[in-house]
Amino acid sequence: MLLQPESSSKPRNDSPPGFKFHSSCDTCLKAKIKCSQAKPTCARCLQQGRQCVYSPYRKIGRPSTKNLPLDQLQQPKGRTAGGTARRSLSRRVSLASPGIENGSRVGNVRHATNRVLHAQESVLVPSQTWSDQELTGNINRLDYGLEGTNWSALEGLLDASMSTLPQADHELASAVPRLDQVHDLDPNPGQEDLTGYLSPSSLSSRESLATTFPPEAEAGSFGLSSEFPFSAGYSLGTGPVLSESLNAFPVLSSFPSSASSPVTEARGFNLLSAPTDRCTFQCYPVLINILNDMNEFQRKSSGLPLDVLLNLDKRVRKVHETILGCPCCLVSCAAALTLMLITMVNINLLSLFERSCGSTDGGSGSSMSRGELNVAPRIAFGGGNYAGQDRSRNPLPYTTGHLTLGNIHLDETVKLVFSRRLVRLYLERQLGVVQQLSQLLGRVEGDGASIKVTQDLLRDQLRRLEHFVGFITLTD
């Protein structure tokens, strides 16, 4: 007699091993009614036209040992006193290990967890954690170490800035350090030398001052007097505008001028951003070189021709735009000192313009105290008849060079009008620069000495600029 196998009441389950499905479909389980348990569609889902889905059971508890590898089955299963700590560490490692996420089964995850656990037990390396304050300090710290900088070479600049408020310009000039003192700005004393980051052209800028310009300029441009040991890079002709010291870094020509865009949001930088790298523009050495050049002019002469002043102003504007695009020198911990140096350069340039007012033939007359502009020439040039007047004393910076339009030499009347217009444009541009620097200084956090000195210098510069503009208006 043949024995037939008993038919099971449960539906046949063709699922892969390790998965067990519900006997009733999801629709019947949700409605809490009896399911016909027919596959692939039960009677109720077939009648209502719904999709019949049988969901697997949710695994509860520890996984089955049938899916574990052979080497795991051979390990002893005895419990130890450290079993609880082992399981706790295993769970932490399984969550923190990135390679375990690729495992598809619980057994593989357990096997990978045990391997990571053995590696953690053999070599235990403590993880280094940083607090928020330490991270902030590490981000805001410059690579070249401003904290350990020896600022002894800048003490003369700071003292000179404070002493210029009641004193004359030559006292400020005497306090500016020489170019050979730039090595005192070494950010890491005893380890590195700043001359390693300076190009040979930057180091030879002082020798370029000894190169005298030809006594008479070519026709078609303002002439430079041979009395001033000025480099050929300052000419208004076809030569380069910037001196050799500025060739050490690229000029950011994409930035607009300070007069056209006094608002700093258009430049796209943030004073509180972290430095990206070491300063590649050599902003501080370039500013020191410019101050040294101004010191030479103030020491050798009481006034400069207008063409020299305008070229010097163009050089300062190029450096100003480049420094405002430097992410290292305008970081929060260095912005105050950078803005103070820029303001000192602008004030020294304004002093050169003031000293050139009332000079004889553009640079060889008597010197004037700062802020004491000579208004007597208004009487000499009254009535607008400039051509027949005596040019022995000039109310504004002036040059003896010829002003040409093509091949035509313009007379002194037209040249005087152009000179006054150029000086007025310089003053209006400087008013925009003062406003821009004031906005940048307002974003710097803290109340250090550099911020207070810069605020005083900006107020003094604004007062002198307004006085200069009023003087030009009165002499028109």
Swiss-Prot record:
Its main location: nucleus. It is found in: Nucleus. One of its GO terms (cellular component) is nucleus. SUPFAM superfamilies: Zn2/Cys6 DNA-binding domain. Keywords: DNA-binding, Metal-binding, Nucleus, Transcription, Transcription regulation, Zinc. Residues 64-77 have a biased composition (Polar residues). The keyword Glycosyltransferase does not apply. Residues 63-92 are annotated as: Disordered. CDD domains: GAL4. It comes from the Eukaryota. Signal peptide: none annotated. Transcriptional regulator; part of the cla gene cluster that produces clavatol and ortho-quinone methide. The clavatol biosynthesis cluster cla and the terrestric acid cluster tra are both involved in the production of peniphenones and penilactones. This is Transcriptional regulator claA. It comes from Penicillium crustosum (Blue mold fungus).
